[in-house]
A protein has these predicted regions:
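Basic, glycine-enriched DNA-binding surface that flanks or lies within the catalytic cores of DNA
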Residues: 1-23
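A short, charged/proline- and glycine-enriched loop
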Residues: 24-30
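TOPRIM fold recognition
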Residues: 28, 44-141
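Helix N-cap/beta->alpha junction signal
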Residues: 34-37, 89
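Conserved phosphate-coordination/catalytic loops
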Residues: 10, 33, 64
Length: 141
């Protein structure tokens, strides 16, 4: 049975995001996402689109539009200077990206904003991309 609960468990600490660490512990790049499903989708898209090895960067999901995990992560990973904002393509996500970009630039980080290519978020982009690949494979048969 799949549940539909989406929320925080009582007592959870918002400074801890969902982190998939890069293979190289000295990696200087992190991609920030709103939700774990989007971070996992971003990693999968990296594999599909041949951008590079999926573990070549850190992936951090913030658990919503929350700056605390960013601050905590950067404290724990002082070598990270390149931050890619992969937030949802909606008004709250776009506004948060502006705020985060400014704060990170003030910290001396290089910031890139990368909207999902298709759909509202990276999971929707992955679903679209996978259906495109499956359709192409079906046409070749």
């Amino acid at each position: 049975c799949q549940g539909t609960y989406r929320g925080d468990v009582t007592g959870s600490q918002k400074k801890y995001g969902f982190l998939m660490q890069a293979e190289n512990p000295d990696c200087d790049t992190v991609e920030l996402y709103e939700a774990p499903i989007d971070a996992m989708s971003g990693a999968t898209l990296r594999q599909y689109t041949d951008i590079g090895k999926w573990r070549s960067v850190h992936y951090l999901a913030l658990g919503g539009l929350n700056y605390l995990p960013i601050d905590y992560f950067l404290q724990q990973h002082p070598q990270v200077k390149n931050v890619v904002l992969c937030f949802d393509r909606d008004e709250p996500g776009l506004r948060f990206a502006e705020t985060v970009a400014q704060r990170l630039a003030e910290r001396g980080c290089n910031v890139e904003k990368r909207l999902p290519a298709v759909g509202k978020d990276y999971n929707e982009s992955l679903i679209w991309y996978k259906s495109k690949i499956e359709k192409q494979r079906g046409e070749r048969v």
